[in-house]
Amino acid sequence: MLSAHGLVKRYGALVALGGVDLEIAPGEAVAIMGASGSGKTTLLHCLAAIIPPDAGSVRIAAPGAPTVELVGMSENERSAARRSLLGFVFQEHLLLPELTAVENTPLPLLVQGVPRRDAEAHAAAWLRALGLAGMEERRIGQLSGGQAQRVAIARAQVTGAPLVFADEPTGALDSHTSADVMTALLDATTGQGRSLVVVTHDPGVAARCSRVLRMRDGHLSVEVASR
């Protein structure tokens, strides 16, 4: 699914990534942990084509599709790759508060030119699958934090992206809601044969993943089997 080799990222004299190698299989959930400043978010951003590394390669091989090399693409090409291959869930859900759940969720499809009626029907199906039946017409401000994150998960999955990146997806939630949201995230990704990469400080979240990787000073220093 994803293969990264020799990733290097520098910010002036600071080496944020010092030559990282990583392989992620289809249907696998991988957690990346580490102290603040260890390089884990920089790694996620390079893997997800949000920022380019200074050296190295990142290849994505979606089932039934040719392998795509993300490094060396123009910004427009990276943007197109993100839309077609990747989904994103962040600690701050980044939903538009003036829109309802069923209006927020299909936005990636609308950008791809899918007719609004079809996009919203597909979005509503994802919202129901994630336990939000009856809440499709509620504005984001009318939802709890956990419900809003479920909308964000639905939005990340609505295009059928084979690989999802989540940066502290439960960081703003209490422990009970965090567990529920993580269950929804896993059901929507690995439960559908898709891959998931999660950056987290929460050992409980990491323990739900197939593998736990630990970042230290820009290197993946430890790999621990989780479940």
Each predicted region: which residue ranges?
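Conserved signature/switch motifs of ABC ATPase nucleotide-binding domains
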Residues: 138, 159, 192
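ABC ATPase C-loop
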Residues: 132, 156-157
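Short coil-to-helix segment of the ABC ATPase nucleotide-binding domain corresponding to the Q-loop/switch region
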Residues: 99-107
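ABC ATPase NBD coupling module
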Residues: 66-87
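Helix-to-loop junction immediately C-terminal to a conserved catalytic motif
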Residues: 48
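Conserved ABC ATPase signature
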Residues: 139-143, 147-149
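The feature captures the beta-strand-to-loop junction immediately N-terminal to the Walker
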Residues: 33-35
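Conserved ABC nucleotide-binding domain
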Residues: 72, 116, 120, 126-141
